[in-house]
């Protein structure tokens, strides 16, 4: 008899009723949810240390352990059972024999427990006849009674939307999902250590701001009752981090949430995690070098290699990353046009319309060029690539290039046809910054909801003097997607935003 064959035969509501009755009986006996069991071992650690020992070597050592976890499988074979429990690290098998437990306990207690219940067990490690490391149990306790059954073991949680809505069930039943989120944690931990080891100071800046700045995006708004003022969830921490550079914190970083009131897609979630860091006395070339080193190291640290496959595409982060300008990328993927044509407003407008871009009257040449780039080239940037020389028109916070003030000392990093990072030598000319803010206000008044607000306090900070600085933002969620072979941003967010479930 096995628990696997029982679950599909019983209606879920009936199973819940049966489990609640069992819980009621536990309450009658005393403490139904004990909290006095202390484990001393995790499944993965036991496998790592003892899997390679022979039966005889392990028996000679007489290793006693205390383990705990959720019961995922059970095979009842008369006077003995095999059960598998799952903890945060993996699974370990229990061998539960009637004669090793107090009289009557096996039949009146253990056999009445259900899959999904959380157990604590003590016993001695041994290796079964099939070679599996197991615990020969001499004490086993029910720590938490699960009132709802787990999804069918053979089919798992197959409904993709349900996996997102009930992530806890996804994590219980889907080892791949657990591995993805463990990898996410390792990636963030690596980045944090990488920057800290280079004397970057981790800081925290406001999540609610009176003026949403630092990016071109539509913000979420809220109301502060005590101050009777409108506030915005931040779209980026950039302007606050640069205030810290003005204040003398010359190398700072923050890993935190940003919020943008925009659409949902496989690449976008309104709430997302960003790394932003700022480095005084450095320029955008230094940033590209540091970013290349950091991303290569992240792949090697988490995946064990700078060469990996994601969504069927082979990537090589071990080679030097390609670098080219916005216009060079357009010409590469649209060789029938020339740099001269792209630098002429009338011709560039014609090219944009040829590729399906609807040019708005308020756009300048720089905006037209970027729209062409995003349509023609962006999705083709598969291998790691830095794109440089972004027009000043679409880069209101970036420093102008010394030799060509039409463009800025800015780059974006792409891999897999997606933008993963945006960085530039920072604009530290207060008067130029004020003028660009005014241009953004004009664009907002012309109907651009994503144009920036005028931030007078930030301009005042710049007037006190900010050293030459470079800064960058990296989308953690998209980076995790790439390094974990995930198709959707929802696969790397524990609790992605979802539409309310219909009744």
Swiss-Prot record:
Catalytic reaction list: tRNA(Lys) + L-lysine + ATP = L-lysyl-tRNA(Lys) + AMP + diphosphate
GO molecular function: ATP binding; lysine-tRNA ligase activity; magnesium ion binding; tRNA binding
Gene Ontology cellular component list: cytosol
Residues holding Mg(2+) 1: 412, 419
Record-level GO BP terms: lysyl-tRNA aminoacylation
Subunit record text: Homodimer.
Record's protein name: Lysine--tRNA ligase
Source organism per UniProt: Idiomarina loihiensis (strain ATCC BAA-735 / DSM 15497 / L2-TR)
Gene: lysS
């Amino acid at each position: 008899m096995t628990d696997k064959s029982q679950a599909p035969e019983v209606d879920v509501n009936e199973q819940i009723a049966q489990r609640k009755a069992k819980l009621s009986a536990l309450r009658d006996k005393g403490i139904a949810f004990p909290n006095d069991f202390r484990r001393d071992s995790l499944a993965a650690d036991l496998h790592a240390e003892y899997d390679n020992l022979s039966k005889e070597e392990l028996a000679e050592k007489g290793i006693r352990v205390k383990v705990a976890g959720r019961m995922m499988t059970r095979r009842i074979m008369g006077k003995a059972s095999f059960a598998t429990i799952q903890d945060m690290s993996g699974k370990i098998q229990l061998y539960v024999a009637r004669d090793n437990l107090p009289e009557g306990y096996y039949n009146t207690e253990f056999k009445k427990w259900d899959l999904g219940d959380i157990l604590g067990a003590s016993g001695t490690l041994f290796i079964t006849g099939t070679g599996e490391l197991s615990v020969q149990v001499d004490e086993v306790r029910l720590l938490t009674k699960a009132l709802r059954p787990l999804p069918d073991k053979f089919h798992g949680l197959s409904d993709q939307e349900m996996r997102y809505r009930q992530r806890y069930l996804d994590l219980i039943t889907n080892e791949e999902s657990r591995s993805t989120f463990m990898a996410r944690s390792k990636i963030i931990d690596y980045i944090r250590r990488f920057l800290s080891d280079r004397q970057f100071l981790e800081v925290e800046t406001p999540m609610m701001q009176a003026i949403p700045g630092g990016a071109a995006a539509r913000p979420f708004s809220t109301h502060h009752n005590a101050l009777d003022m409108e506030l915005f969830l931040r779209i980026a921490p950039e302007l606050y981090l640069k205030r810290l550079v003005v204040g003398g914190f010359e190398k700072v970083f923050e890993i935190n949430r940003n919020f943008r009131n925009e659409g949902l897609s496989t690449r976008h979630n309104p709430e997302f995690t960003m790394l932003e860091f700022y480095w005084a006395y450095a320029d955008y070339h230094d940033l590209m070098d540091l970013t290349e080193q950091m991303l290569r190291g992240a792949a090697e640290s988490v995946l064990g290699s700078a060469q990996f496959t994601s969504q069927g595409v082979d990537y090589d982060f071990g080679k030097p990353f390609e670098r080219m300008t916005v216009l060079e990328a357009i010409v590469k993927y649209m060789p029938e046009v020339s740099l001269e044509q792209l630098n002429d407003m009338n011709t560039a407008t014609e090219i944009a319309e040829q590729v399906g871009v609807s040019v708005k009257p308020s756009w300048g040449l720089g905006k037209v060029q970027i729209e062409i780039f995003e349509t023609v080239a962006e999705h083709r940037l598969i291998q790691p690539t830095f794109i440089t020389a972004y027009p000043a028109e679409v880069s209101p916070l970036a420093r102008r290039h010394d030799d060509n003030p039409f463009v800025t000392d800015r780059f974006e990093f792409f891999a897999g046809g997606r933008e993963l990072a945006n960085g530039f030598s920072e604009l530290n000319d207060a008067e130029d910054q004020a003028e660009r803010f005014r241009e953004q206000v004009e664009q907002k008044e012309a109907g651009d909801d994503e144009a920036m607000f005028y931030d007078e306090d930030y301009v005042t900070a710049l007037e006190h003097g900010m050293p030459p600085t470079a800064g960058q933002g990296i989308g953690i969620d998209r980076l995790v997607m790439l390094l974990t072979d995930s198709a959707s941003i929802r696969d790397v967010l524990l609790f992605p935003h979802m539409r309310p479930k219909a009744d």
